[in-house]
Amino acid sequence: MQTLGKTLNMPLYRGLSNGRPESNRSDAKATLGPCGLFQCFLRPFRVAGSARLSRQMLALLVVAVALPAQAGLAIQSWTAKSGTRVLFVESRSISMLDVAVDFDAGGRRAPAGKAGLAGLTNGMLALGSTGLTESQIADQFADTGAQRGARADQDRSAITLRTLSSSAEREAALALLATLLQNPSFPEEALNREKARAIAGLKEAETRPAAIADRAFSRAMYRSHPYGASASAESVASISRADIVAFYQANFSARSAVVSMIGDISRSQAEAIAEQLTAGLPAGVAPAVLPPVGVPDPSPIRIAHPATQSHILLGMPAMARGDADFFALTVGNYILGGGGFVSRLMNEVREKRGLAYSVYSYFAPLKEAGPFQIGLQTRKEQANEALKLVQGVVADYVAKGPTAAELKAAKDNLAGGFALRIDNSRKILDNLAVIGFYGLPLDYLDQWVANVERVSLADVKSALARRVKPAEFAVVVVGAPE
């Protein structure tokens, strides 16, 4: 189960969105804090009494693997009367409906000193509404057999819903979701409980080298930019109910929202659902223009820790969502450190020298320049050697680019595995949300393989030269050799 991510505002969205292979995500930074409000994945079912509802819940559980891989997705898009952008895929293969409502209400929108506010606000939406207690909300979702989820990253906050598409269950689940989105009560008692839970998790995380490294790396990479802010026990403790109400009123508006849907409904039904979910949202305010992402602090950060291994992170802000270099960098990263055992870093660091069990690299594009990150763990006495080796491998790769054989293997693997990235409704929903929120072309998924196959050696080399500058890398070593 996904835990409290990068201290309430880590990137929790998955799928093909960042060009990083699903099979190489052992480094996912889901390490800080207890399970609870801020988990990416949907809450488990509460047990319902009737055999009919039990069968409905079984259908919900199997739907994630029952949808065949699809080619040529017919994505429909329009703007609702409320001003919300809507993306919809009609899918009649299973009697289900998946919905996501994404808001421009990620961690970057939190005021200075209030890191964690975005995730806390998002999670609190389901803990009380006008005329409904937390327990009543949970019971009503259980009665319909629906699943509700919450997720957040630096850019977005979202609520998700999975329900049967039959009229009674669908209408009840959507009515409840609309109530949560439009009339949250943010009860003080629930807020205090969730703050205490989060603070306990954050304090525990402060003892773990992976969490310490992640926080220090974000700060070194983004300095004072909002992307570099990580929640702390102090920042969460400072969040009041008034802060949450103000953040909700300012950022959870129809004009900042994107509604994504896939399922067994018609276009006209989808239009009505989008209006139902967004018509009563706050008016919101025009989002503040964020400062540009600057150059990282290149001074290596070495933090003592009693752990037997050193945790090493290095990288820099590199690429925004929709960047023209995305596909060249996706292919290039697969060769460098995204391809598991066939990557250069794995070959040099693990296979040839045995300095680490695993080493990875990835790009995570955001609204502004998202991180390019390399990570590994190694024994303390080997940390300096491993870091120097990684820096050398990256510098050589950026200078010379890949070989023709590496390029072909990477493109074949990425193109051949693409179908697995959209083989169920949940994955498709995640990608619809990415397309809608970041304004990507509607044929983005249809053209993904062709765009990968179009990448040349020159494309990779020139993109790396523009986006990956080893001399500017932020470097963090936790558990540094003494």
Show where each model-derived region lies.
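Short, low-complexity, charge-dense intrinsically disordered segments
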Residues: 8, 17-22, 26-46, 51-54
